[in-house]
Amino acid sequence: MPKLLRFDEEARRSLEKGVNKVADAVRITLGPKGRNVVIEKSWGSPTITNDGVSIAKEIELEDKFENLGAQLVKEVASKTNDVAGDGTTTATVLAQSMIREGLKNVAAGSNPILLKRGIDKATEKAAKYIKDKAKKLSGREDIAHVAAISANSSEIGDLIAEAMDKVGEDGVITVEDSKTLETYVEFTEGMQFDRGYISPYFVTDAEKMEVELKEPFILITDKKLSAVKPLIPVLEKVAQTGKPILVIAEDVEGEALTTLVLNKLKGTLSACAVKAPGFGDRRKAMLQDIAILTGGTVISDELGINLEDVAIEDLGRADIVRVKKDDTIIIGGKGNPEEIKKRIAQIKSQIEQTTSEYEKETLQERMAKLAGGVAVIKVGAATETELKEKKHRIEDALSATRAAVEEGIVPGGGVTLIRSRKAVEDVLKELDGDEKVGAMIVYKALEAPIRQIAENAGYDGAVIIEKILASKEESYGFDALKGEYTDMFKAGIIDPAKVTRSALQNAASIAGMLLTTEVLVVEKPEEKKEAAPAMPPEY
């Protein structure tokens, strides 16, 4: 395939044009008065959004050289979104400002490598400033504020705060479509897994077709149970206590199943059998989770424990177990809280190490079940277009809230970025030549988000920046929604520190790469050949 090449200044100008086209489409969405963008879809209704990364992802330019610049900005937005879940528009605005200033200096004869070095040094100091100024979340109200700002809706903020309140920081919160127009939170407490009773004869509530066992003993094994002889000693021990038993095994069949069913029907021993959740190694891990949650032991040949030797202490305990046709819920497991914490920490470190998204989701789900439950935010809307947009905002707000829990919060509205210029001023004193010019590029870019927020709300950015910098209060800023100056923390205008920091670092990374680019290589478009003339009709 033949290639087209473009060099030096011409190459960088093409990249800049592509960057500007994407950034101009994205930056109008910044802040509480940001505008919407309507995106055509090849099928179905168009999407209306003010989410930076969604807009950037949709843009593909006709000019192949310009498109390379557009792809670089997309990279800034999606990388920030992947790491922090929000801040994509801020990252794009910062990147555009750095690239514009940087290219001016390269055209004037500055050394791009030294400029990049200056940009990196200034960014490092500003990012450290942001991290140091972060304040830990102090409760439900802070969580609601962070989520409300990300989603641009206090109603969504309250929903996310309610969900986090119920499941804790490590809990799983999922977003699903609601069957009504309402948006609400549904909560499932305890550990739930998708395996139901093996036989309907175990049912204790015929109306609901479910089994409810109060304060049961729980036998957990990875074996297939078919013979009854190995089971008899443990069943006799449980029968003497007068409590019910739940058997979780690879499978229960034949004599073993018949014995459990007959004991249940005769009223000798209330029992229920379910298959173990998952497959292969995942099954082993989930059985171990259940054992730790309930304070039991997994009866396994690998551990050298035989069913005949099982003591009552090897069985798990819980307050209530509910078993339906397709799922089982264990509520109030009696496991050692310290052991449960250790297991959660172990799963957390596995999440950090894994690169597979599917694996990550599965591990998070396991962690949530150990932590005590799953919250589902059911999203309702009048039209499909509104539903898609609302769902997307909630998912974004959830990610931003998790980022805030992780690294803390800083004053929002671009205030922290402009205040971080103090840290860059210290770097400027140490540098000279083109490195100093590079640091100055970052210094100027740090005011771009606040300027854009003001302009989107119909105010003069320069006037607002001057007024904010005149105040010594670090959290003093401009509330663009109400059009007044205020303490950002008190007004609840806060951003997760991780979002602000990631936006700056990703913008600087792409700007540095673009400034040091000398050559562009793209595929030459194929020339469309004229179609052959139609055959003359036959007579």
UniProtKB/Swiss-Prot annotation:
Biological process per Gene Ontology, one example term? protein refolding
Give the Enzyme Commission number.
5.6.1.7
**Which positions in this protein are listed as binding ATP?**
29-32, 86-90, 413, 479-481, 495
**Protein keywords:** ATP-binding, Chaperone, Cytoplasm, Isomerase, Nucleotide-binding
What does UniProt give as GO cellular component? cytoplasm
Which SUPFAM superfamilies would you find in this protein's record? GroEL apical domain-like, GroEL equatorial domain-like, GroEL-intermediate domain like
**One Pfam family of this chain:** Cpn60_TCP1
Domain of life from the UniProt record: Bacteria
State one molecular function term (GO): isomerase activity
| Principal EC category | isomerase
Q: Where in the cell is it found?
A: Cytoplasm
What is the reaction catalyzed? ATP + H2O + a folded polypeptide = ADP + phosphate + an unfolded polypeptide
Where is this chain primarily localised? cytoplasm
Query: HAMAP family given for it?
Result: CH60
| Protein family per UniProt | Belongs to the chaperonin (HSP60) family.
Describe the protein's quaternary organization and the partners it interacts with.
Forms a cylinder of 14 subunits composed of two heptameric rings stacked back-to-back. Interacts with the co-chaperonin GroES.
State its role.
Answer: Together with its co-chaperonin GroES, plays an essential role in assisting protein folding. The GroEL-GroES system forms a nano-cage that allows encapsulation of the non-native substrate proteins and provides a physical environment optimized to promote and accelerate protein folding.
What is the protein's name according to its record? Chaperonin GroEL
